A protein has these predicted regions:
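Conserved MFS/SLC helix-loop-helix module at the cytosolic interface between two early adjacent transmembrane helices
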Residues: 65-104
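Helix-loop-helix hairpin linking two adjacent transmembrane segments in secondary transporters
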Residues: 139-190
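Helix-breaking motifs and short loop linkers at transmembrane-helix boundaries and internal kinks
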Residues: 46, 78, 99-105, 116, ...
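Extracytoplasmic gate region of multi-pass secondary transporters
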Residues: 34-35, 212-269, 356-364
């Protein structure tokens, strides 16, 4: 079906709005497992820390895989087609997960959900690039701002909902809403599916693999996200409950602060660029230093038994640079040819989620060493101190690599 350019743009704008709704829940889904139900999985289903970490991190691995497997096709097949694939997978995985009790079935559902979530992001990014090419970074930041309020909803409000109706019913609701959003996309998609662009799909990827500055950026930024998401999705709420004996609502409120900061920072970046006179490296390097300071502050809080406010300060320091994904995307875009924008963002996101998954697994292994010392599922402070030693070393590596990322902006 051939439609006018004006109607095509209007339809794509409506589809983009539905994509933002999906991204709200894909962002929320990153921290749903284990997140608020860590203790439920531990006490109700008798999962070990390693199993809980595995069920949570499989989402991140498949999310990362989607960035390459689907990312290399995003510029050829168009945002709407990519969005349909991702939205369908994400919705199905989200709907079926609450009905599972076996760790293998849970893992399969989370794997499907993660792959779908990553594909939704690529479809959304491609749509934004098609509709707002000149203002790509700014509009992507706005979309991420809305999406990142998903984790905010997934903390205190969701904890209250779980207490009221149980975690299974509470976790079914996001899937039902996503099904409605997908229905809207299906109604609007006619005439918006672009014709496949011919060409060698893997050539841009091979070219990018040889781009040393791109990989310096990817690894340095990925370390930032790996550290942040260990707290957001794995142990942030639990370590506050365990070590400081705060109730689950106050603990989840602390994690909420992280989500709010990350959400807001996606649009603050443009203001920071003006202050830095367009310098990318100044902002990026300052971000890596904040992560190192945050990791060391968290280590001090557990090792020296400092106030919970010290740990919250550490969380805040870690959250600031984790909210700069739209900024990192600008650098990735500038380090590669314009026609490879979609793939550049995909490779950046792939790197981030590989490290998020790895850090999730490693956190489970580290806490597992103190399994025998855990009383009623509560880990000792030494376990969290060991975890923050690992995070601090990782943050130092991010700082070193960040110093090698070249400047791509203009003063």
């Amino acid at each position: 079906m051939i439609i006018s350019d004006e109607l095509l743009r209007r339809k794509k704008m409506v589809i983009l709005l539905f994509a933002v709704v999906l991204s709200f829940f894909t962002s929320m889904s990153k921290m749903l497992v284990p997140g608020p139900i860590y203790n439920n999985l531990q006490a109700e289903l008798l999962f070990t820390p390693a199993v809980i970490a595995a069920v949570g991190s499989i989402y991140m691995y498949t999310y990362a895989a989607s960035q390459l497997l689907i990312g290399i096709y995003s510029d050829r097949y168009g945002g709407v087609r990519i969005l349909l694939i991702g939205g369908s997978l994400f919705t199905l995985g989200t709907l079926f997960f609450p009905f599972c009790s076996d760790p293998w079935l849970m893992g399969i559902c989370r794997a499907v959900t993660g792959f779908g979530a990553g594909t939704v992001f690529l479809g959304e990014a491609k749509l934004i690039n098609d509709l707002f090419s000149v203002k790509f970074g700014f509009v992507l930041g706005i979309a991420l701002l809305i999406g990142y309020f998903g984790p905010v909803t997934g903390t205190v409000p969701l904890v209250g909902l779980i207490s009221a109706i149980g975690w299974r019913k509470a976790y079914f609701i996001p899937g039902a809403i996503c099904a409605l959003a997908m229905s809207g996309i299906l109604l609007m998609m006619r005439g918006t599916i672009k014709k496949t662009v011919p060409g060698q799909t893997f050539t841009p990827l091979f070219r990018m693999l040889k781009n040393r500055p791109m990989w310096l950026l990817c690894i340095s930024a990925a370390l930032i996200f790996g550290i942040y998401y260990v707290l957001l999705t794995q142990v942030g709420q639990k370590c506050i409950e365990d070590f400081y004996r705060l109730d689950k609502y106050l603990a989840s409120l602390c994690v909420t602060l992280l989500s709010v900061i990350v959400a807001l920072n996606n649009v603050v970046v443009n203001f920071l660029l003006k202050l830095a006179h367009g310098s990318r490296t100044l902002i990026f390097r300052c971000g890596t230093v904040l992560v190192l300071l945050g990791s060391l502050t968290g280590l001090s809080a557990f090792h020296f038994h400092l106030s919970v406010w010290v740990l919250i300060a550490a969380f805040l320091l870690l959250a600031f640079p984790a909210g700069f994904f739209s900024f990192y995307s600008i650098i990735a875009k500038e380090l590669n040819p314009p026609e490879d924008t979609g793939l550049a963002v995909a490779v950046l996101n792939f790197s981030a989620f590989i490290f998020i998954a790895l850090f999730g697994n490693i956190s489970g292994v580290i806490l597992g060493f103190w399994k025998a010392a855990a009383v009623n599922g509560i880990f000792p402070g030494e376990a969290y101190s060991a975890l923050f030693v690992f995070l601090s070393v990782s943050a130092l590596l991010s700082v070193i690599l960040g110093l090698l990322v070249p400047e791509t902006g203009k003063n």
